[in-house]
Amino acid sequence: MVLCRDFLTWCNETLQTALFKDYAPNGLQVEGREYIGKIVTSVTASRAAIDFAVEQKADLLLVHHGMFWKNELPTVTGWKKERIAALLRHDINMAGYHLPLDAHPTLGNNAQLADRLGFATEKRFGEQNLLNSGSLKQAKTLGALAAHIETVLQRKPVVIGNPEREIRRVAWCSGGAQGFFQTAIDEGVDLYLTGEISEAQYHLANETGTAFISAGHHATERYGVRALAESAAEVFGLEVCHFDENNPA
């Protein structure tokens, strides 16, 4: 067992949370028991994830998407009340790490995604260094790369571009980062990979010749929170369980 505050201090220092301008609080969002020995991870602090943490008798739920965001109504009602009530009823801490967890050079969502897809990271760039660029270890056609991504992430991606086009240089940013497509285009890459697509990206891809893949917000952000928890477990001797949902978004 370890003091929850010591665990949180380690996470905050490891992820350098103070360096980020975020639209969600990073760190403890719902306070539970003082000491923790078992952590459950999840992409999102959903009711299903909370129920799983209760079943596992976890002391802390560690997530990427917490429950509090800027520009939301500052009220605790409905589904939010039910989630928080379940955590408080069982004295479970809930901590969330958003942009700092996307950006960490080894534990972050972008780094972990690159490891799984075989991307060699060469550069971090863009807003708060949230984008990554690099090269494939071996060039692939867009169609072959999309098939590889589907196999690894277990989700069929949305692909915009000529499937026969050779892809060598890629840029990527996990989650809902389709708004950074122009930044990736300016970097001169062959492909931009992120988790979501909006209407405009279809036209940008066709008109600039830079391919675009949307591989799923949830699917591209599974791995950072797991890596963070497993790294903390080695430091503090914690037990870790991972929760996942079949979220198609």
Curated annotation (Swiss-Prot):
- Which Gene3D superfamilies does this UniProt record tie to the protein? NIF3 (NGG1p interacting factor 3)-like
- The keyword Iron appears for this protein: no
Keywords of the record: Metal-binding
Top-rank taxon: Bacteria
- GO cellular component: a single term: cytoplasm
Q: Which cysteines form disulfides?
A: none
InterPro entries per the record?
A: DUF34/NIF3 (IPR002678), DUF34/NIF3_sf (IPR036069)
Describe, as the record does, how this protein assembles with itself and its partners.
Homohexamer.
Q: What is this protein called?
A: GTP cyclohydrolase 1 type 2 homolog
